[in-house]
């Protein structure tokens, strides 16, 4: 059985949520209203708590001292409720992704180069999380890693500084690199790969 057979279950979606959320790129439209309401309550309690904690202990009133403990307990309870609501939401999303009828809704976007068409997926939670998990699966399975131009330049500068020889640097680019990849051969290879799960193949 493929190691990615369970890649669209709750745990995988939760990992995807944490990865995106840590970067501050988690959009509200992909989360449930109930979860968002609890998260807002938590932020308000955190704001009130910080307002009290900024005061020195000697300057706090008895009411404020009591409020600190109260807020901490309420925030702890709220965090548990958030976790439950998020689990319920992601479990439902997972079930819809794993259904046989689920597909990405691709919409063509305007492109400056007709040879480089652009497409966007639908704005649903199912499509967002499915794409996150699919991309992660492909990166892990095929060890896909794209270095940024800044990282490449830094490495190049380091190498040139270590060697005092004279060099000429020529910058080149492959025209329409990704567009030139024969898709029929690529999909044939993916279809025959036993490590890639059936769901990922169907989404591709």
Predicted regions and their residues:
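Short alpha-helical scaffolding segments that buttress acidic/His motifs in well-ordered protein cores
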Residues: 202-204
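Conserved two-metal-ion catalytic palm core of "right-hand" nucleic acid polymerases
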Residues: 1-200
């Amino acid at each position: 059985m493929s190691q990615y057979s369970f890649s669209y279950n709750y745990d995988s979606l939760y990992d995807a949520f944490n990865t995106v959320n840590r970067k501050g790129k988690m959009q509200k439209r992909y989360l449930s209203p109930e979860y968002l309401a609890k998260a807002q309550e938590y932020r308000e309690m955190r704001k009130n708590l910080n307002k009290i904690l900024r005061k020195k202990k000697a300057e706090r009133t008895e009411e404020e001292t009591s409020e600190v403990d109260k807020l901490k307990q309420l925030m702890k309870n709220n965090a548990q409720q958030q976790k439950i609501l998020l689990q319920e939401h992601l479990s439902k999303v997972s079930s819809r992704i794993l259904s046989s009828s689920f597909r990405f809704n691709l919409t063509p976007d305007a492109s400056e180069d007709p040879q480089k068409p652009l497409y966007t997926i639908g704005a649903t939670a199912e499509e967002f999380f499915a794409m996150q998990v699919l991309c992660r699966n492909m990166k892990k399975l095929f060890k896909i890693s794209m270095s940024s131009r800044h990282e490449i330049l830094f490495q190049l500068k380091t190498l040139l500084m270590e060697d005092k020889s004279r060099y000429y640097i020529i910058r080149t680019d492959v025209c329409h690199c990704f567009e030139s990849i024969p898709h029929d051969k690529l999909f044939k290879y993916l279809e025959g790969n036993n490590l890639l799960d059936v769901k990922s193949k169907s989404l591709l």
